[in-house]
Amino acid sequence: MAKRVYAPDCHIIVESGLMDCSPVEVPRSVGDLRFMAHCGCIWPNVRFVGFEINEYLHKANRLIAFIGGAQIDPYGNVNSTSIGDYHHPKTRFTGSGGANGIATYSNTIIMMQHEKRRFMNKIDYVTSPGWIDGPGGRERLGLPGDVGPQLVVTDKGILKFDEKTKRMYLAAYYPTSSPEDVLENTGFDLDVSKAVELEAPDPAVIKLIREEIDPGQAFIQVPTEAK
């Protein structure tokens, strides 16, 4: 959508080794053939793409990365590895893939469903480092301190991180949600005092998403009344 609506000159890089992609429809996974449409380059060392590409672009300070996960804590540390004890997990996921390298070297935008079981004060495993435990946390672990999580985008609103404390706060909520709704679905104390209501999306953009970008409704479900 970014390339179609407001950032036509952006370059999409995928952790599976694909660079400068221009998919017509939204891909279902990082290995989806849709990503190869008009793809500019296939990186040869796919196993290390998460670190090699991101380390290079970190030096150029030109990368914004997107990641997801099963759990997130107040400082933007993300778990996409397992639920429960690491050696005897209740559930094992496919992470990290390239997510650790991405979160290490990039400014990230984290996308998640907003549920109390996902927004936890302490996550079961740190797959992708955020601001660790606050100011100086990344530097203490030898991670670049000039990059880190910038936004958390959920189905209820947009959250940011305080510049001084590095702790998450609610910046904006959708017309279909409210600060109270966000708090009810968050498993830790969250500052909502700065939150503003976002405007409803442009109908033309909604039409573009439903009819051209995601016509198969892989990610965006069309309400029955809108069909």
Where do the PLM segments sit?
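Short, Lys/Arg-enriched charge-dense amphipathic segments
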Residues: P8-E15, A37-G40, Y75, D214-K227
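Conserved phosphate- and dinucleotide-binding cores of soluble alpha/beta proteins
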Residues: V24-L208
